[in-house]
Amino acid sequence: MTYKKSLGNVSTKYYKMKEDLQLDTGNILETPTIAYETYGKLNNEKSNVILVCHALTGDAHAAGWHDGDKKPGWWNIIIGPGKPLDTNRYFIICSNVLGSCKGTTGPCDINPKTNKPYGLDFPIITINDMVKAQKKLLDYLDINHLYAVVGGSMGGMQVLQWTITYPDMVRNAIMIASGAYSTPQQIAFNAVQRRSIIEDPNWKGGKYYEEGVSPEQGLSVARMIAHITYLSNESMYEKFGRKLQDKNKFSYDFSTEFQVESYLEHQGSTFTKKFDANSYLYLTKALDYFEVRKNTSLEEALKPVKSRILIMSITSDWLYTHEHMEEIVMALRANNVEVSYSRLNSEYGHDAFLIENGQMNYIISNFLSKARVKDVMSHTTLTLDYTADIKEAAELMMNCNKTHIPIVDDGKEIVGIITAWDLSKAIATDANSIDDIMTKNVLTCTEYDSLHKVIRKMKEHNISGLPVIDKNHKVIGSITTAHISNLYEK
């Protein structure tokens, strides 16, 4: 079957760590497994990687179709050919979070120490633990930098944690409908949901796996409560109003009468068939514990952040309000972080980031299109001292397979550049020193220049690369057409 603007059939992969994972609580999780999917092609420079982080009950299946699917991955409106997370340009990775039940190790999996499901023997995990597990996956895939990390809701928390825990890895970050910490109201909603599960007689202290039962009633109620927080009053009015379900007058009893009641019951019932109750307990607890401030100011907590960031709130989201997200924006700006802020106009509430493809497409595409040199450049480059002789330059080019080398002075400032053509000229003119043949008016760029500007400069001067310099004219890297071709060529 062909799916327009879709990836077609995809499959989930699994990575079992060879080492144990140290958790924030001090506990150890023995060689966990990470479920993940990838879309698109990794370029030679490995500079086009985007990590997508899912929300509370999501999974690694973010886009495309699995055999037998009735609908595609949960963010198929955003990921795929020609979409904001364009698989013709980017290599997309999405992994299931630690503690879930969708392929990554969680409480429903077998504890190697007992050969029984973990249940409540599974250790408490945090958002940072999820991020550390994702980092282990990237290490396994030999990926050292992320062009971007993107996520909404709990996925947005992971995005923010990435920029703090691994600031040198992340070039761009997109945080949608999320927060820097869980509010008392959010914790309260989670507490009531967990209580509904724990009070279900079939929960059995978390050991229901061995009993062949499941706390479906408690999990269903928990999902119903959560779903209310994902919607807005406006969307409920538009979708349901006060319309009755399969009747035209009140029954004056305690049966299901309103359409909105029936809808919530359906959401709760179907959810119990595809999610584990203990995983729900652990993941909502991870939400509660999330707090980047850790007894300091938000501004101070965000000091490590180096990436360019897009913060996106939703006008009708009362779970993660725009005030909460604007607090993050102000703290980042106080730290001189390059931050963009957009408000998604929608009546769909918190879940709008999974629905509003039009606005989402524009905002995300616009942000990612403003890539800078530092997003794709090589941070290691060969240089040659200006006192070196022509033979040294020729040997360096030949041994390292380079066609041009920046020339630097004693202070490592760039003073020229020598190319393979210059070496040919040296032979023809019988030149004796690099100073005789090097180009002294060197074309350069900075790490903050836009890629569009660099591309124009390369085309105008018919060159394939530029040295990247800092404010003191010291060479800090290089950028070539190979670095950027996968982002700008179809």
Curated annotation (Swiss-Prot):
PROSITE patterns: CBS. Its EC number is 2.3.1.31. It catalyses: L-homoserine + acetyl-CoA = O-acetyl-L-homoserine + CoA. It is found in: Cytoplasm. GO terms for molecular function: homoserine O-acetyltransferase activity. Its main location: cytoplasm. Substrate binds at R223, D351. It holds the Pfam family CBS. Belongs to the AB hydrolase superfamily. MetX family. This is Homoserine O-acetyltransferase. The gene is metXA.
